[in-house]
Each structure stands twice: as C-alpha cells, then as structure tokens.
C-alpha cells in the first residue's frame, strides 16, 4: 500500500512516490498556483518581520577594502 497525501492546493489525493511527478501537488497547475501564492505573499512563514536598521543596511568598508576596489 502506498502513502497518499492531499494536494495542498486542491485537496486531490496524490500518491507519494517517485512516479508522482509533481508531488505533493496533483499537477503542474496546482504547483504553479501555490508558487504564485508565495510570490504574492498570500502565504508566508510566521515570524517577526525583519527590517534592516540603517547600521546594517550598508556595511562600512575599511580603507584597505576601498583601496582593493580601486585597483580593479
């Protein structure tokens, strides 16, 4: 007996095996719908939102690093 999981997008049962090309999704369409939801931020992983402070936004380069950059 093989393991079956529900497609995260539409709920269709999907056999979990190497033969299931789009697992855990039932189709490429469902896979792309899910990907689009992540890109549009409809889906996300819970946690604190990260906003870089002005100190960490741009690293300060040392005089040595600047000299190396000017050589190129």
Swiss-Prot record:
- Lineage: superkingdom: Bacteria
Cofactor(s), by name? Zn(2+)
Q: Binding positions for Zn(2+)?
A: 7, 10, 26, 30
According to the UniProt record, where is the region Disordered?
A: 44-72
* Gene3D superfamilies for this protein: Erythroid Transcription Factor GATA-1, subunit A
What GO biological process terms are annotated to this protein in UniProt?
Answer: regulation of DNA-templated transcription
In terms of SUPFAM superfamilies, this protein maps to:
Glucocorticoid receptor-like (DNA-binding domain)
The UniProt GO MF terms for this protein read: DNA topoisomerase type II (double strand cut, ATP-hydrolyzing) inhibitor activity; zinc ion binding
Name the Pfam families for this protein: YacG (PF03884)
Similarity comment text for this entry: Belongs to the DNA gyrase inhibitor YacG family.
Per UniProt, subunit arrangement is: Interacts with GyrB.
What this protein is reported to do is described as: Inhibits all the catalytic activities of DNA gyrase by preventing its interaction with DNA. Acts by binding directly to the C-terminal domain of GyrB, which probably disrupts DNA binding by the gyrase.
Quote the protein name from its UniProt record: DNA gyrase inhibitor YacG
Name the gene that codes for it: yacG
């Amino acid at each position: 007996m093989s393991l079956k999981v529900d497609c995260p997008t539409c709920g269709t049962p999907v056999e979990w095996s190497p033969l299931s090309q789009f697992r855990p999704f039932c189709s490429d369409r469902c896979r792309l719908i899910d990907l689009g939801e992540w890109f549009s931020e409809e889906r996300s992983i819970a946690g604190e939102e990260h906003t870089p402070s002005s100190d960490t936004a741009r690293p300060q380069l040392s005089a040595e690093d600047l000299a190396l950059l000017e050589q190129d």
